[in-house]
From Swiss-Prot:
Alphabetically ordered keywords of this record: DNA-binding, Nucleus, Transcription, Transcription regulation
Coiled coil: none
Positions of transmembrane segments: none
PROSITE patterns assigned: ETS_DOMAIN_2 (PS00346), ETS_DOMAIN_3 (PS50061)
Purpose of the protein: Controls the development of red pulp macrophages required for red blood cells recycling and iron homeostasis. Transcription factor that binds to the PU-box, a purine-rich DNA sequence (5'-GAGGA[AT]-3') that can act as a lymphoid-specific enhancer. Regulates VCAM1 gene expression.
Main location: nucleus
Segments of the chain annotated as binding DNA: 111-194
Protein name: Transcription factor Spi-C
Length: 248
């Protein structure tokens, strides 16, 4: 990569974060990795600018892929805003959302039943086992003839050796009723997610991230188009605040 192109890349990287910072609702905190990256870009620009005076030929420049840079940047932006929106929820109602779980490794959190149920509700192939009654209110119902099948699939998903039954699963649902994540509705096999849980499970993180990313990076494009960024950023930012919870 030419020196001029590398300089433009470093400047564009800083500009991207400046835009995110200006449009965020609170202080936008850079991680140490991004601070180190900015320092690295600036340092290399300084060395290149003075290398000719020492008779040193600049080394071959590594190619930085904007997919990785922008993908990480939007992770920080959207996760930061979700974190801020959760600060107003009472502590006893907070449940770590699946979208913020660690991706693999020993620190990965186990999938919880209410997460699995919401996932199944969002899966058309599971409509014979569980269905929405009122999605906006988080009300759902188990299909009587296939409720055992859903329970068995849940047991397999957990890695249980013994077959999971609906009776055992219903016991866990009653425990949720005591803690407030899911409550029983006065209707057969019908339950309701709490508002706080429904908001976390329905958070439009991945949808918005895809919109944010696709506005200025084409499918086969590994670099950033600043013209596309300027033309589409305001549109994308407005969509983030206007879109309601997407349909599953």
């Amino acid at each position: 990569m030419a020196c001029a192109e590398q300089d433009k890349l470093g400047q564009a990287f800083e500009d991207a974060f400046e835009v995110l910072r200006q449009h965020s609702t609170g202080d936008f905190q850079y991680s140490s990795d991004y601070k180190n990256y900015l320092a690295f870009i600036n340092h290399r620009s300084h060395i290149r600018g003075n290398s000719n005076s020492y008779g040193v030929q600049p080394a071959e420049e590594p190619i930085y892929n904007w997919r990785t840079v922008i993908n990480s940047a939007t992770d920080l932006y959207f996760e930061g805003n979700i974190h801020q929106s959760l600060q107003n929820i009472p502590e006893n109602q907070l449940v770590q959302p699946a979208l913020l779980q660690q991706k693999g490794g020993k620190g990965r959190k186990k999938l919880r039943l209410f997460e699995y149920l919401h996932e199944s509700l969002c899966n058309p192939e599971m409509a014979s086992c569980i269905q929405w009654i009122d999605q906006t209110k988080g009300i759902f119902q188990f299909v009587s003839k296939n409720k055992e099948k859903l329970a068995q699939l849940w047991g397999k998903r957990k890695g249980n050796r013994k077959t999971m039954t609906y009776q055992k699963m219903a016991r866990a649902l009653r425990n949720y009723g005591r803690t407030g994540e899911i409550i029983k509705i006065r209707r057969k096999l019908t339950y309701q997610f709490s508002e706080a849980i429904l908001q976390r499970l329905s958070a439009p993180y991945f949808l918005e991230k895809e919109i944010f990313y696709s506005q200025y990076v084409q499918p086969d494009q590994g670099y950033l188009s600043l013209n596309n960024w300027n033309a589409n950023y305001n549109y994308t930012y407005a969509n983030y605040h206007e879109l309601s919870h997407p349909d599953c």
